[in-house]
Amino acid sequence: MSNFQSVKIFMQTFGQEVKNKTEFPSEKITQLRYKLIKEELEELNEAIKSKDMKEIADALSDILYVTYGAGHAFGIDLDKCFDEVQKSNMSKLGSDGKPIYNESGKVMKGPSY
């Protein structure tokens, strides 16, 4: 079972709406999902500032969890989306088969992207 599916079980168990088709939830749920992700990003920022690896791991895990929850709230299958992003990212190689990086270390799009 994927993490995305585990979050679905949590949401169903706790009476949270899980959409079966892609559509906007209520404004209240939309704002809640945004707020949860924002809160976890702020916690990550604080953990990084304090160089607390345990809190960094906690924040990153919570970011995944609330993001998966947002996917279910909007009816977006994030397992499928992730697979597409992975395929796309793996196509970011130069013609020599090596990654292309910009000056900050970000992987850039290759000619076959």
Can you say where each PLM-predicted feature lies in the sequence?
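Flexible "arm" and connector segments at domain edges
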Residues: 1-113
